[in-house]
């Protein structure tokens, strides 16, 4: 398998859109978490993981998935406001905690300056019993490869 640079699937650029701002004209706080999930999904896709094999959808019965990955903790820090038209870079730093959990650390940058951070902890559970279980092979590989040379 060809060695790839994790930056290929762990960095995303985006532009702030009007619908993502509040009445004061700045990005609504919840948008950071939406951007985190979008960045994570795009990262998995760029790595080669088929999203419908990881996330439940109307096309797949949840019981057909081997694991579910609910969020059990999240937090965000906002250092500067963002406005419509701002271009930002989102960097994702995944870290495996143990055999059943991992955290996604995100850094938001504008013109090279850090303007926000988030961390989101996921736990792997059996979707039927809701008991903790081991992370899937796909997620384990993504976590391992994401930690190399970044």
Swiss-Prot record:
<dbReference type="GO" id="GO:0042372">
    <property type="term" value="P:phylloquinone biosynthetic process"/>
</dbReference>
<comment type="function">
    <text>Catalyzes the hydrolysis of 1,4-dihydroxy-2-naphthoyl-CoA (DHNA-CoA) to 1,4-dihydroxy-2-naphthoate (DHNA), a reaction involved in phylloquinone (vitamin K1) biosynthesis.</text>
</comment>
<comment type="pathway">
    <text>Quinol/quinone metabolism; 1,4-dihydroxy-2-naphthoate biosynthesis; 1,4-dihydroxy-2-naphthoate from chorismate: step 7/7.</text>
</comment>
<keyword id="KW-0378">Hydrolase</keyword>
<dbReference type="Pfam" id="PF13279">
    <property type="entry name" value="4HBT_2"/>
</dbReference>
<comment type="pathway">
    <text>Cofactor biosynthesis; phylloquinone biosynthesis.</text>
</comment>
<comment type="similarity">
    <text>Belongs to the 4-hydroxybenzoyl-CoA thioesterase family. DHNA-CoA hydrolase subfamily.</text>
</comment>
<protein>
    <recommendedName>
        <fullName>1,4-dihydroxy-2-naphthoyl-CoA hydrolase</fullName>
        <ecNumber>3.1.2.28</ecNumber>
    </recommendedName>
</protein>
<dbReference type="InterPro" id="IPR022829">
    <property type="entry name" value="DHNA_CoA_hydrolase"/>
</dbReference>
<dbReference type="InterPro" id="IPR029069">
    <property type="entry name" value="HotDog_dom_sf"/>
</dbReference>
<dbReference type="GO" id="GO:0061522">
    <property type="term" value="F:1,4-dihydroxy-2-naphthoyl-CoA thioesterase activity"/>
</dbReference>
<feature type="active site">
    <location>
        <position position="22"/>
    </location>
</feature>
């Amino acid at each position: 398998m060809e060695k790839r640079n994790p930056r290929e699937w762990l960095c995303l650029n985006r532009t702030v859109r009007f619908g993502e701002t509040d009445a004061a004209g700045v990005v609504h706080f919840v948008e950071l978490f939406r951007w985190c999930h979008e960045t994570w999904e795009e990262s998995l896709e760029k790595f080669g993981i088929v999203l419908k094999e990881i996330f439940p959808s109307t096309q797949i019965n949840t019981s057909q998935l081997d694991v579910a990955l609910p969020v059990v903790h999240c937090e965000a820090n906002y250092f500067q406001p963002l406005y419509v038209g701002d271009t930002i870079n989102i960097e994702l730093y995944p870290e495996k905690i143990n055999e059943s959990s991992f955290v996604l650390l995100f850094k938001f940058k504008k013109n090279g300056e850090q303007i926000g951070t988030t961390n989101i902890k996921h736990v792997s559970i059996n979707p039927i019993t809701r008991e903790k279980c081991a992370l899937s092979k796909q997620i384990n590989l993504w976590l391992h490869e994401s930690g190399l040379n970044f």
